Amino acid sequence: MSKEHTTEHLRAELKSLSDTLEEVLSSSGEKSKEELSKIRSKAEQALKQSRYRLGETGDAIAKQTRVAAARADEYVRENPWTGVGIGAAIGVVLGVLLSRR
């Protein structure tokens, strides 16, 4: 799952949920109890679906993070001096940036 796909998926889920909740709020004053219960059950169902899908997306992101960490670990184990050099370079850059403040 690519980063762009994940971001778009999250946006679509949140928009769907907010649209459903907006419908509930905007129509609550003019509907009967039966209609309100239908709208409420629709909102609850949308919330459950969004939680499930967002949970799946979170799991996919966690898996991608584990894979990236494993690749970085493997690279550093195969090229330890390169890893030390990268760490030192990052330290120098951060030191310079922090010393300017």
UniProtKB/Swiss-Prot annotation:
Please tell me the species this chain comes from.
Escherichia coli (strain K12)
Note the topology in the membrane.
Single-pass membrane protein
Q: Effect of knocking it out? A: Not essential (in strain K12 / BW25113).
What does induction of this protein depend on?
Maximally expressed after 2 days growth, i.e. during stationary phase (at protein level). Expression is regulated by RpoS.
Molecular function as annotated in GO: ribosomal small subunit binding
Query: Which family does the UniProt entry place this protein in?
Result: Belongs to the ElaB/YgaM/YqjD family.
Q: Which residues cross the membrane?
A: 81-98
Query: What's the stated role of this polypeptide?
Result: Upon overexpression inhibits growth.
Lineage of source species = Bacteria, Pseudomonadati, Pseudomonadota, Gammaproteobacteria, Enterobacterales
The cellular location(s) given in this protein's UniProt record come to: Cell inner membrane
Q: Any idea which UniProt keywords this protein has? A: Cell inner membrane, Cell membrane, Membrane, Transmembrane, Transmembrane helix
- Give the record's subunit note: Binds to 70S and 100S ribosomes, probably via the 30S subunit.
- What is the name attached to this protein's record? Uncharacterized protein YqjD
Record's superkingdom? Bacteria
Q: What is its main location?
A: membrane
Transmembrane found in the keyword field:
yes
Please give the InterPro entries that the UniProt record associates with this protein.
DUF883_C, DUF883_N, YqjD/ElaB
Give the CC-aspect GO terms: cell pole; plasma membrane
Q: Which gene encodes it?
A: yqjD
Region: Required for binding to 30S subunits in vitro; residue ranges are 1-12
